Amino acid sequence: PSALSAVRIGTNSPARARSAGPRPARYVSHHSTRPDCNDADWAHAAIAAELIGKLQAQPLPPIRLTATIRTVKITEPRKGTFIFDMGQNFAGWPMLAVNVPTGTQITLRYGELLNKDGTLNPMTSVCGQIKAASAGGPGAPEVAWQSDTYIAKGDGIEVYMPLFTFHAFRYVEMTGYPGTPSVATLEGLRLNTDVAEVGTFACSNELLNRIQTMCRWTFLSNIFSVQSDCPHRERFGYGGDLVTTCDAFMLNYD
């Protein structure tokens, strides 16, 4: 289940709320997703109006899992705050695997860079460049960094992925984990529209080879059905970004 689902900032998923029957739902604030929350006054979802138009399959390839990224290093710049270094910027999901007590609340935040003291710099991945208090809706943070919260059910190994959003990052900050995590606690799952490869490039100059590799990872991180300007902050298909890169993109992918 998901008590908060915002595609551009993240999710809040209390596993204890799982049940066999239908669950009431509403858009709630972070304060309403605590393990001891009383949901007696929650309203049921409303039936949407009839769709207008023709329902058809999208003409472009689907978004698929195209690579698994392993954690290369874990640091603890502050007690209880763990930084997972994935070794590579990419767009997709974290996959969290934990065996923790009931009600354990684990929060993940994402960024492309670290501060000088080794802590996460989440300002590299804020939604819409919202870096200070603003007029957001229910549950909106003052700073719109990307984060996900998982509240454990506590019945053995639990695997969590924020299925209703995606993030772009190299570093993941984990708080709320009881004990010391391992590299197996968190993996990265790269997602992108499954475009076919049409060309490759390699030469004797390692700098040029590295630039080519970086370009290809950037192309794939920025194609979720449409080519975007960036996969974390704005995620829109701006024409300027497309025009300046389309030649290189089409030489690599269909």
Residue spans for each PLM region:
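Well-ordered alpha-helical scaffold segments within catalytic/enzyme domains
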Residues: 177, 244-253
